[in-house]
């Protein structure tokens, strides 16, 4: 797995897909990314503050889901969804979904599509993965400058430069090498700002 940068912008989807295809990007698949906010059920009249977490589902990982809660991110089996429904201790409050198209372009994989919240499009999601960072010699976290140049130089213009490095220190249990857990952190932070 390479290093990923995930962001949204308020432009038009056809413009972005034309840029990707002009650069030589080949559309290889479509899918969805689903992020649901769950709140703990507390008794009526209780002074307890309900705990919350986000649950992420990726079509590309049909057997896995990712849970983001406070300072912890966990990869679990997809059965977690049915367990939540059966136990009835948490209630799904809202869901944000991205309907993505996946493009391959040399050492890059680009996923792009509308972000939908309550039937309203809230922006365009862009995920850019630099796959050459997955080699053991290169730390994925050292690829941020190249990723920034690729995004801002080829996919823009954007009103502000796109941030490609992220502070993962709030999640001390994350592995040292970039993983799907880091990607889930980026998605939850993005979807929080959209809702």
Curated annotation (Swiss-Prot):
Keywords: Activator, Nucleus, Transcription, Transcription regulation. It is found in: Nucleus. One of its GO terms (cellular component) is mediator complex. It comes from the Eukaryota. GO terms for biological process: regulation of transcription by RNA polymerase II; transcription by RNA polymerase II. One of its GO terms (molecular function) is transcription coactivator activity. Disulfide bonds: none annotated. PANTHER family: MEDIATOR OF RNA POLYMERASE II TRANSCRIPTION SUBUNIT 20, UBIQUITIN SPECIFIC PROTEASE HOMOLOG 49. Belongs to the Mediator complex subunit 20 family. Component of the Mediator complex. Component of the Mediator complex, a coactivator involved in the regulated transcription of nearly all RNA polymerase II-dependent genes. Mediator functions as a bridge to convey information from gene-specific regulatory proteins to the basal RNA polymerase II transcription machinery. Mediator is recruited to promoters by direct interactions with regulatory proteins and serves as a scaffold for the assembly of a functional preinitiation complex with RNA polymerase II and the general transcription factors. This is Putative mediator of RNA polymerase II transcription subunit 20.
